Amino acid sequence: MKTIAGLSWISALSSLASLPNGLGVSAQNNTPSTWPLHDNGLSDVVQWDHYSFKVNGKRLFVFSGEIHYWRIPVYEVWEDLLEKIKAAGFTAFAFYGNWAYHSANNKTLDFESGAHDFSKLFEIAHRVGLYVITRPGPYVNAEANAGGFPLWLTTGAYGKLRDDDPRYLQALDPYFSKFSELTSKHLVTNGGNALVYQIENEYGEQWKDRTKKIPNDAAGRYMQALEDSARANGIEIPLIHNDPNMNTKSWSKDYAPGAVGNVDVAGLDSYPSCWSCNLAECTGTNGKYVAYQVVNYYDHFKEVSPTQPSFFPEFQGGSYNPWGGPEGGCPGDIGADFANLFYRNLISQRVTAVSLYMMFGGTNWGAIAAPVTATSYDYSSPISENREIGAKFYETKNLAMFTRVADDLTVTDRLGSSSSYTTNPAVTASELRNPITKAAFYVTIHSVSSSSTTESFKLHISTSVGNLTIPQHSGSIVLNGHQSKIISTDFAMGNKTLTYSTAEILTYALIDSSPVVVLSTDVGGSVEFHVKGATKGSLASSGFTSNATFRAEAGGVTTNIERVTGMGVYQFNNGVKVVLADKPTAYLFWAPNLSNDPFAPVDQSVLIQGPYLVRGAALDGDVVALKGDVKNSTTIEVFAHETALTLSWNGKKLETSRTPYGSLKAQISAFNGTIPLPSLNDWKVNEGLPEKMPEYDDNGAAWVVANHTTTPNPTKPDTLPVLYVDEYGFHNSFHLFRGYFEGSATGAQLSVQGGLAFGWSAWLNGDLVGSWLGNTTLGVGNMTLSFANATVHANGTNVLLIAQDNTGHDLRGGATDPRGILRATLDGADFTSWKIAGEAGGENIQLDPVRGPLAEGGLTAERLGWHLSGFSDCDWASASPSTGFSGADIKFYRTTFPLDIPEDVDASFAFILNATGPKTVRVQLFVNGYQYARFNPYVGNEVKFPIPPGILNYAGDNVIGLSVWAQGNDGAKVDVEFVQEYAVESSWSSRFDSEYLRPEWTEERLAYA
């Protein structure tokens, strides 16, 4: 082995003294003892310092990802998601609460019905083995309706929101207290898995003037009130917060010692490639968009939170797709390459706690969404909306698996970052070194991070056997396009050491006390690694096109492989086993743990290659019992304890053989059956807008007289009465306004507000007089209507009906922006009265607590329950939405079909909608009572709508409803297709008893005609 003395090419290290054990450079003077070790004064179970979090005295690399239980309201599916997150090597997951989902009115909280019982997340987390980052709000943003505020809060009657206004604090107290109380039963301090608890969300309001550090006292009192409430309701774990960007610098005890409202650990949110597919939304925060341009966070954390871990409660996991965005989202610059480059870049900046937003996005079903986004909340996440995993998941997994076993990564100092570490100025490396063990991690990246060139280089490193330039003997390290690589040195594997490897470390396990380490590199790449303490090495198995060369040198064995394809196994006489895999092979490498410890102890891990997904492993005598998913029949190879003789897969024993190097092999078969899909032919139809006719009777329970002449809303209407729907207890989606006037009028002026992409139509005495078709950049639709082509009763009563499609309440300070009519005037007459209808029962009567307060709007079909099973459509006419109808109207179509999905299969299905007639239509798709699609082709491009199991009945009948609103007189035609997304043989069966999620129609609906 060649060594190089006097590393003149690392100027940052030139003045550092020699270290023990032959290391040529020293870490900076900082050591863990230099930095204060913090706890919150209530418990020392969770501690933290400059380097990382500690749990029960052990340092933890927090690799987490966000899911939203309220965007996937089926708790059986939560287990599928958390098993996938665990399988990806994560140590934690995060979730937001949603106050609106739990609170229909200011007297009601529901944490029990259906998926409202979020405590099941903690139970699954404990079983699977994940810590939990709990984020209750009360405001969460999340592109959710009103940012997660309950919609009854948006009227203005509760004062200034997100402030210390006593009306607001009193309103939030029941929710926040109960959420804290329920979480307190699952804290890591009492044997649960809740690790930290977030106060508010992206509330960077600590300063009136940050440069002068003039505090915003009201914001401080608000934060302190939330913190006091959390503590009073049993939250003993650390309190955290997430700054929205690097400018606000709020709530850190390091930055503002002693300030009111500070939290225990301050974090930062960042979306360097934009949180939206519309890049223009981010230029104000991020500046001009440059694909793959990384951001300097290192200096921010040094300034704002130097005695705390560098922590991202949110780091970009994808982007949401706004109205008008591309079908399927925008994965182009935020796919697998993004995950590779940006997440390793965080490592280079000493980040030891990160949660990806989102890991699984889910769906904006019902009225979940804010106006900024449509039905899909796929977010281009590692786990797709239909729960499928692919390259981005695998790329993220490969890094997370490494961080879970790289104990030395939790205590590092950054010694330098420059191109001087490499032999190619186009490549920069950052050196992180553990000041105790002297292990190091060199994170390599293009010097211009946005570069997509292929660059070969060698790397100057400092190790326990001297200063080296690697690879020493042949080949080079290569960055292929948008790529970063972490080169580890003096990597501890139990009591053995991998001195260095030019391939990345994927994971390792101690099998019968001996390390098996898995390395990964690009297909066709060359690799060099040095195993310390060995004197001989041998090739045990190889699918490679070139053989290995072994050299005994410098207290170990250096191994060179010229070209890597597939997987090879190398054995060394000190007990170390090295598995070398190319990237596609490494994508299908797994390390399930035999315990449910989130730390995943390496002596209880099993290493597995082959399947699409491995969800878990257990030892049952001499059987390694594996569970997971398989897409294609494949060979499975397992590195497990020598007492294991046989493999089983999803409960079935496999014909197993042992390789000469000790692993177990078997064949597993995939699901090769077919799932017959129903034809959607037998539709029935009914009139969906009887309210447009003047003879319609609006004296029933569905209607409220709109007679308010004042409003607490800060936005005052231009005309009276007040026609804001929230004033009258209606909040969701579809609303109706009936305005009466006597005698002649020639037209009307209307200003209607409903959020971005919303629409409205107006009928006079049953005749269409105008439609606002929607605009992706406007939340207000102003129109002058002419009555020239309508029937006006000059000597009688006239009725103007306005149907409004509300796309949700705005975010942040816009939550109180009203929904409804801002101005309504007539030419030649005056309105004499108004009535408003919305969801059946309004906010005060909950007809469907299981689906919850955001499930329905005010369509006739919704109020009367036509979308529910148990409703009889026997007297409806037969007609298909693909045939359609003429004229401006709303029709409701209904059909039923069965599904019979096999046991032990995870299958996913979606509906595809296509407007074959005019695009000026607004369509809602209902599946077993859940609105799971808003299809608005005039303003949006989304056409495919995945439906999760549980919402779909996989073992029986499914009721499908389709509301079709033609906004023009040329009518509408809509094709509906039901497709299979995938079907895999799985230990997690998508067929389960979900009847509890689908309460049926009841007669009380009849009152809301």
UniProtKB/Swiss-Prot annotation:
It catalyses: Hydrolysis of terminal non-reducing beta-D-galactose residues in beta-D-galactosides. GO terms for molecular function: beta-galactosidase activity. It is an enzyme of class 3 (hydrolase). GO terms for biological process: polysaccharide catabolic process. The keyword Plastid does not apply. The active site is at E202 (proton donor), E314 (nucleophile). Gene3D superfamilies: Beta-galactosidase, domain 2 (2.102.20.10), Beta-galactosidase, domain 3 (2.60.390.10), Galactose-binding domain-like (2.60.120.260), Glycosidases (3.20.20.80). The keyword Glycoprotein applies. Residues 1-27 form the signal peptide. GO terms for cellular component: extracellular region. It is found in: Secreted. Glycans are attached at N106, N467, N495, N547, N593, N632, N672, N707, N775, N782, N789, N795, N914. Keywords: Carbohydrate metabolism, Disulfide bond, Glycoprotein, Glycosidase, Hydrolase, Polysaccharide degradation, Secreted, Signal. Substrate binds at Y96, N141, A142, E143, N201, Y271, Y379. InterPro entries: Betagal_dom2, Betagal_dom2_sf, BetaGal_dom3, BetaGal_dom3_sf, BetaGal_jelly_roll_dom, Galactose-bd-like_sf, Gly_Hdrlase_35_cat, Glycoside_Hdrlase_35. SMART domains: BetaGal_dom2. Cleaves beta-linked terminal galactosyl residues from gangliosides, glycoproteins, and glycosaminoglycans. PANTHER family: BETA-GALACTOSIDASE RELATED. This is Probable beta-galactosidase B. It comes from Pyrenophora tritici-repentis (strain Pt-1C-BFP). The lineage of its organism: Eukaryota, Fungi, Dikarya, Ascomycota, Pezizomycotina.
